[in-house]
Amino acid sequence: MSSTQPAVAKPVTQPNLSLQEKWSQQLKTVPGRLKFSRAAAIAAALLFAVLAYVSYIDLREAVQTIGRDTVPSIIAAEKVRATLADANANAVNFFLANEADDGPSWSAYRREMDEVQDNLIVAAQNITYGDEERQPIRTMMMQLAAYERLIGQARAHRQGDFHSDLDAAEQLMRDKILTAASALDKANFDHLTATYTAHRASFSGKVAPAIAGGVLLFVLLFSTQLFLAQRTRRTLNPGLVIATAVLIVCALYAVSIFPKVENSLVTAKEDAFDSIHALWRARATAFDANADESFYLLDHGNDGKQAVWTKKFYDKTTLLSAGDPDRMLVYAQQGKRFNGYLGDELANITFPGEKEAAMQTMRAWACYLDIDQQIRHLEASGKYKEALALNVGTQPGDSNWAFAQFDDALGKTLDVNQHAFDNEIAHAFDLLSHFVYALIATVVVIIAAIVIGIKPRLDEYRF
């Protein structure tokens, strides 16, 4: 009798599938598709956050560089330059009017030199661009010591021959100190121009990826919503609806503030700062020219040196308004463009009260130049004492009075633009101040809504 052995079934072996094939099979199932959509949407949300943050950083850095780093340094450099030029003019007037040691010119000179020293110490402690700023500051500090020594020597000899020391001090001021002040201004101005130009050229390109990231996330959320509606017979998934709504709100928020920040930046730079820069350069140049007028009279009797001072004076005044001042005043009243710092300002009128202040500046400048012509006519006519009295006088109709009127009007024009600049920069920072928090909250809510919204649908396929 034979026994029959039962047949042993062979185990079924699963084919070795590649990762790609496994994913392909998973995506053919509803749970697999939902898991993929969830992962893709979360990744897109994180990508959107990163791209939006990059756009934010680019915009904020531009506002920071222009509003807090370069412009204040440029203005500080121009203030130093203007104060130095005025201190130099006061030193000359001290000798020209033969004032007492406690006279107004010497007191103003000492006050301004102390102010410059304090400002340079502050500038040395706030260097942003390395040797580009450090070297001019060092030069000014070193050369100012030599300048004050020469002025002190001239003062000690002012009852005798003080001209050689005063001339040496004047040359040092113009060739070394004021040149270094201009270099400090230029270092920051070049960085401002480069930053602003690069930002304006690239801003749209840097915002575009964030927009693309938002669109990608929206498409993924919408397609997942559509897939669920088709497969689960549910019209809307609450979690995905919330995620989509939050994304739209965040996008609208970004779209609303980014152009406003950019507009504030443009207004601050092109409308306010460009005028501020022109006006500060006008002030510094005018102070320098005013010193030339005093040197012209100080060299009374020396026709050769007086001719040199006259040329220097007109070279500088032309920088403020190229051409006859009375004709330029008519041009300004008619709204016609003319060259010079004051012409640049009058061509860039933007803010309330700015035109009136700028026109008053132009009128005061024309008045000052008319009085200068009277001084030179009196000197040429042999009326030195009358010319001197007109130069150093402070009563209405005198040169110093007219110059003070000009500087006061220029200061008011500066104040209008400085106030506008400060407001625009503050507004830009205020708009950006909550963006990062809003972005973080947006991403957290979107990811949470995606996970919570899809989880119940995945749970339906578990058994």
What are these regions, as identified by a protein language model?
Residues 1-31, 192-200, 423, 427, ...:
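Terminal targeting segments of Actinobacterial cell-envelope proteins
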Residues 49-69, 251-271:
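N-terminal membrane-insertion alpha helix
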Residues 62-139, 268-358:
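Membrane-proximal N-terminal soluble sensing/regulatory segments of transmembrane proteins
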Residues 127-201, 343-407, 425:
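Polar/charged, Q/E/K-enriched amphipathic alpha-helical segments with strong coiled-coil propensity
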Residues 192-211, 421-438:
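Membrane-interface helix-start motif
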